[in-house]
Design a protein with these regions (language model features):
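Internal transmembrane alpha-helices of multipass membrane proteins
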Residues: 1-70, 154, 158, 167-168, ...
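Gly/Pro- and small hydrophobic-enriched strand-loop and loop-to-helix capping segments
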Residues: 161
Length: 191
């Protein structure tokens, strides 16, 4: 364990930095990168420094959260391909956003576009994307029925990892749901 001990604090630091990133970014792609970056250190914290059943707990944590993240990524990509490159900013001033493809990941602009004529055409597709985001965020919250990874992860995680898991990481799901799914798809949230 002494050989592995020098990695414990850097993993905690990477996870804390990524957690801060999740809560402060205004770009959906960067949000997703930080979201994933929180999962990797926690996986290794549980796997290397966890309790007796740490391998099972870390793999269960990884499978649940990775599957949810892939579903969330699909929803994010659908949102990306439906963004409008010409965005109206406060005061009626227009500016061109986006890359060579003409699409962007800007959360503020996506929210503005969603409140206008809707980010994604078609009610069915909007509800489907909202459902993908809901599954991704609900798994991280964790909500029933995608919560079964949590007891194993908490019991097997080292004390510092369990504190960060309970204190901040579980709140990421609620924050992401409120910040992204509710603000961009309010009509799907009501249904």
């Amino acid at each position: 364990d002494a050989k592995k001990g020098h990695l414990f604090h850097p993993l905690i630091l990477v996870m804390e930095g990524a957690l801060i990133g999740v809560f402060v970014v205004l770009d959906l792609f960067v949000f997703y990168v930080f979201w994933e970056l929180t999962l990797i250190p926690m996986f290794f914290l549980i796997l290397v420094w966890g309790g007796d059943d740490r391998r099972y707990a870390s793999m269960k944590f990884f499978i649940y959260t990775f599957t949810a993240s892939v579903l969330m990524l699909i929803g994010i990509l659908v949102m990306y391909f439906h963004t409008d490159p010409l965005i109206v900013i406060d005061g009626g001033v227009s500016k061109e956003l986006g890359s060579l493809t003409g699409h962007h990941f800007d959360l503020v602009s996506m929210t503005a576009q969603a409140s206008g004529n809707g980010l994604i055409p078609g009610e069915g597709l909007r509800h489907f994307v909202w459902l993908l985001l809901l599954i991704g965020f609900a798994t991280k919250m964790p909500s029933v029925p995608v919560h079964t990874w949590l007891p194993d992860a908490h019991v097997q995680a080292p004390t510092a990892g369990s504190m960060l898991l309970a204190g901040v990481m579980l709140k990421m799901g609620a924050y992401g749901f409120l910040r992204i799914a509710v603000t961009i798809f309010p009509e799907s949230t009501v249904v």
